[in-house]
Structures are given as structure tokens and as C-alpha cells.
């Protein structure tokens, strides 16, 4: 395991329980859900937009560009983007990361 320190827990709280951070050149979306901290690649697999709408009731995150929705626990795309009906598309998931609170700072396991 290679834990990397990111932002303070207070910064996550101030951002409404969701935040995107840069860890070694990777943008990672972190959200505090009802069952703890979750992290996943913050770049949508459809059009490379940054994710940003965490829905705690469904434990999903939505891409603000085209509406694709991903499970925060698995990274699986559960709702494809809203694009032209005949547009070619792959339902690619996102990498998930373990996240922990260590002495008031969020750490991400980048392995």
C-alpha cells in the first residue's frame, strides 16, 4: 500500500462532503457517504470531464457534462451518458481507491 496525503477532513466538510484532489497526476474524487469514505478516478470514462455530483442516497456520482452515473463503491457505470441515441459508446467503469482519515487528513492508497 502506498498512502498519499491529500487535503484535510475539514476541507472535505467545507466542500459539502465531496472533493476532487490531485494525487501524483491523477484526479481522484473523494466523497463521504453513509458508510465511510470513498474514492474513485474523477475523470469520466466517456468524455474525460471531471465528475462532481455525489448522490448519497444512491451512493453514486454523476458526471456534470453528460450525466453518466457511477457507483462510488465499485466504479461501475450504472447509467450511460445522455448523448445521441445512435452514438457509439462503451460502458467503462472507473478505478476505485481506498481512502482513510489519518490524523485529520485524507489519505488515498494509490496502489
UniProtKB/Swiss-Prot annotation:
SUPFAM superfamilies: ISP domain. Keywords: 2Fe-2S, Cytoplasm, Electron transport, Iron, Iron-sulfur, Metal-binding, Oxidoreductase, Transport. It comes from the Archaea. This is Probable sulredoxin. The keyword Iron applies. It is found in: Cytoplasm. Pfam families: Rieske. One of its GO terms (molecular function) is oxidoreductase activity. The lineage of its organism: Archaea, Methanobacteriati, Thermoplasmatota, Thermoplasmata, Thermoplasmatales. Residues 3-108 form the Rieske domain. PANTHER family: FERREDOXIN-RELATED (PTHR21496), SULREDOXIN-RELATED (PTHR21496:SF24). Binds 1 [2Fe-2S] cluster per subunit. Its cofactor is [2Fe-2S] cluster. One of its GO terms (cellular component) is cytoplasm. Belongs to the SDX family. Its main location: cytoplasm. It comes from Thermoplasma acidophilum (strain ATCC 25905 / DSM 1728 / JCM 9062 / NBRC 15155 / AMRC-C165). [2Fe-2S] cluster binds at residues 44, 46, 63, 66. InterPro entries: Rieske_2Fe-2S, Rieske_2Fe-2S_sf, SDX-like.
